[in-house]
A protein has these predicted regions:
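C-terminal catalytic-base region of ester-bond hydrolases, centering on the histidine
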Residues: 133-206
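Serine-dependent carboxylesterase/thioesterase catalytic core
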Residues: 2-9, 14, 18, 22-36, ...
């Protein structure tokens, strides 16, 4: 079993290294995809991701584990794959034009650093038209962000970047984790849940 692992915006594959280690320890081969939102455009990045997946897994069984923007890239690429993943696991995925992206989109420094892909996260039409995975998928949402009077999210459960309700997709199960957005991939419970799901054969994975 292969795992294609995709990091989030402004990060590198290094941010997913602990999760990758835990999966490898369980006997899962890991392949980490790298991209840079500051220097890449959406079309080129999704094309590279599709080619990366096809090259790394060939006809072998595989899953996708993606953090944040990585899940958006994954959803865009899935329909074009001739060999589909057996399952997808999304960590803190933005599934709509989230409040944080909409607030940051007009700012010059954000446009400069986050590039085209950062702007797309703030567009309702773009986010609502992304394909919903047809294969078994699970979402992990963090709720360790500040709530209450001094929180930009008010009383809404959040991970410091996304509100939990901004990570949901119809018909896809979600597991809440006491994690912040930036570090949710280091949550051992999530890694073990992915491993247990695969090993248990729940999704009929080999």
């Amino acid at each position: 079993m292969h795992a294609i692992i995709i990091h989030g915006m402004g990060r590198t594959p290094l941010s997913m290294s602990l999760l990758a280690y835990r999966l490898r320890k369980a006997g899962i081969k890991t392949n980490l995809f790298a991209y840079a939102v500051t220097f890449e455009h959406w079309e080129g990045c999704t094309k590279r991701l599709r080619q990366f997946i096809e090259r790394k897994v060939a006809e072998e069984d595989f899953i996708v584990v993606a953090h944040s923007l990585g899940s958006v890239l994954t959803r865009a690429v899935l329909p074009s794959l001739s060999h589909k993943p057996a399952a997808c696991f999304f960590l803190a995925p933005p599934t709509q034009a989230c409040d944080a992206a909409r607030r940051l989109a007009p700012r010059y420094w954000y446009r400069l650093l986050a590039g085209e892909m950062g702007q797309l996260l703030a567009k309702h039409e773009f986010m609502s038209n992304l394909p919903v995975p047809e294969m078994p998928t699970k979402i992990y949402a963090g709720n360790a962000g500040l709530t209450g009077r001094y929180s930009p999210f008010g009383d809404e459960p959040n991970d410091g970047v996304l509100m939990v309700k901004e990570t949901l997709l119809p018909g896809i199960p979600v597991q809440i984790a006491p994690s912040l957005h930036t570090f949710i991939m280091n949550n051992k419970v999530i890694a073990m849940d992915i491993v247990d799901t695969i090993k248990s054969g729940k999704y009929k994975l080999s």
